[in-house]
Regions:
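An N-terminal, well-structured beta->alpha segment
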Residues: 1-64, 68-69, 151-172
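Gly/Ser/Thr-rich beta-alpha loop segments that engage phosphate groups in nucleotides
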Residues: 14-17, 50, 79, 98, ...
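N-terminal small/polar loop signature for handling phosphorylated ligands or for N-terminal nucleophile
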Residues: 39, 44-108, 189-231
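Gly/Ser/Thr-enriched, mixed-charge loops and adjacent short helices
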Residues: 109-231
């Protein structure tokens, strides 16, 4: 199978959904990732996805590929990227994949990957493409069996861990603009647990990003938050 070379970046895999990043391509990447995991003696990979519209379907395609290699999958559902890394530690898998478009436009999505505690980058990411192109893929059979899939809600443990580590010197009143990105699913609950009074802006998760793009490095995306603070 030929995979677009340009989607394999230095620190992640990233492409345009339906063009350079399709469910079929992601499934093949999943099988390559599962094969690499087995070579590293890893048996289970956590998967999460952000609020982009393509997230659930790409996460399921990724899971199919990983399980085809004989590796188990724990689906975390809609989560922020740090929650996948936390789950890999908390659940003892040492492996996780976040399906996320990061700061890119809505028609993009991608994969950030950790195997055996290593964040994949550079040559290791390129080796996944090489596995697919050369057919160096493990495939489950009647003897080994396909990997199993389960689901786990990591949110409560994630929030509890942060609350146990962070103590505010005094209560705070804060405004949070999530730009309709995935943090909106958890921000209020987390900050209130820390003792904050929270004013929410655009915290409904919506992959269309109807208000502004969830990229705070662009100055105009901070306009609504600045207005809220002034008021």
């Amino acid at each position: 199978m030929q995979i677009p070379k340009e989607i394999f970046k230095a620190y992640d895999i990233r492409g345009i959904v339906g063009k350079t990043l399709t469910p079929e391509i992601v499934e093949a990447i999943g099988q390559a990732l599962g094969s690499e995991a087995l070579d590293r003696k890893q048996t289970t990979i956590c998967i999460g996805y952000d609020g982009r519209l393509s997230g659930p379907s790409l996460a399921e395609a990724l899971s199919r590929g990983i399980r085809q290699a004989g590796v188990n999958v724990i689906q975390l559902g809609l989560v922020a990227t740090p929650m996948v890394y936390f789950a890999a530690y908390e659940l003892g898998t040492a492996c996780g994949v976040m399906v996320t478009g990061s700061h890119n436009p809505p028609d993009y999505n991608g994969l950030k990957m950790v195997l055996a505690g290593e964040t994949l980058s550079g040559a290791t990411i390129q080796s996944l493409r090489a596995r697919i192109e050369t057919g160096n893929l493990k495939t489950s059979d009647l003897k080994t069996g396909e990997g199993k899939q389960s689901h786990h809600d990591i949110a409560a443990a994630y929030i509890a861990k942060i609350v146990s580590d962070v103590k505010l010197a005094r209560p705070m009143k804060i405004a949070v603009d999530c730009g309709n990105g995935v943090p909106g699913a958890y921000a209020k609950k987390l900050y209130e647990a820390l003792g904050c009074s929270v004013q929410e802006l655009f915290c409904d998760v919506d992959g269309h990003f109807p208000n502004h793009h969830p990229d705070p490095s662009v100055p105009e995306n901070l306009d609504d938050l600045i207005t809220a603070l002034k008021n």
